[in-house]
Amino acid sequence: MVNNSVATTGFVETKEMRIKRRTSLRKQVFKSWQLYLMLILPVAYLLLFSYYPMYGIQIAFRDYTPSMGMTGSEWVGIQHFVNFVNSQIFWDLFKNTIIISLYSLLCSFPLSVVLALCLNVVRVEKFKKVVQTVTYIPHFFSIVIIVGMMFQIFNPHMGIFKHVVELFAGEGAAVPDLMGKGEAFYHTYVWSAIWQNLGFNSIIYIAALSSVDTELYESAQIDGASRFKIMLHIDIPTILPTIVIMLILRSGHILSVGYEKALLMQNDANIKYSQLISTYVYNEGLMKGFKQYSSATAINLFNSIINFICIWSVNQFSKKVGESSLW
């Protein structure tokens, strides 16, 4: 058997070689012990908050009650998944979540790339810094502040939006209540999120553009290339791998629309449009107590499975048509 292995591979690792490899690994760890020490906290964080909670996934397949514990609760299989998919509200939740997610992706993703390309063109550093500061600051506002600002701005009686409408349509013109109009929920939700995160999302593309060799710009200018052609043939190809990777990552959150903002914007007028999977999980798992805890866990697991399928599919497609992929 050993001779066949040697004949096939042409190489057999001896005991001395294994000891030497282990010694070499210890030397590398000892040489860079500071870096390995810095890894302790992030690894501990992942183990504690990402991997350890996976033990609780079994709640999705049980009729969980606190008195019985996770392992003692009755096993019901995929019953909670079936109940959710067959519920009357399922397709409304799924539709609203998909619409907001795709709407946000199609609008915010290209706009952040465009902003990065435009800022890269600006040569006046003071103006560039002012624009960056103005676009970055909203990202650090809490959701509560953002929604509060929206209610003040779009107030049909005394908001800024009212004055803008009257400026163009005349005083006394009818002002729509955007925060109380169901059909407007998608637009107000998505565009307020774009305003809040546009600058911050462009940072990674600005960083990628900083790696472009300045000699390429000089050569293109000598050849008489316009600024648009430079952007088309130098800037975009440079950040294209970054764009693909970020798109793949975003596809893994296709159903992960946060519940906080939707709940704060939610009212009786837009409830049909603002009910998302995340808000439903919040109401089932936290507002109704342990009675619906298993159902909420099952819905969250369903959400994660769909997200994984999306990110895997997009990654495989990217791998076939291009060179960039996550794995």
Task: Please identify what each model-predicted range represents.
Residues 1-28:
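Short, Lys/Arg-rich, polar N-terminal cytosolic tail immediately upstream
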Residues 28-327:
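A structural signal for multi-pass alpha-helical bundles of membrane permease subunits
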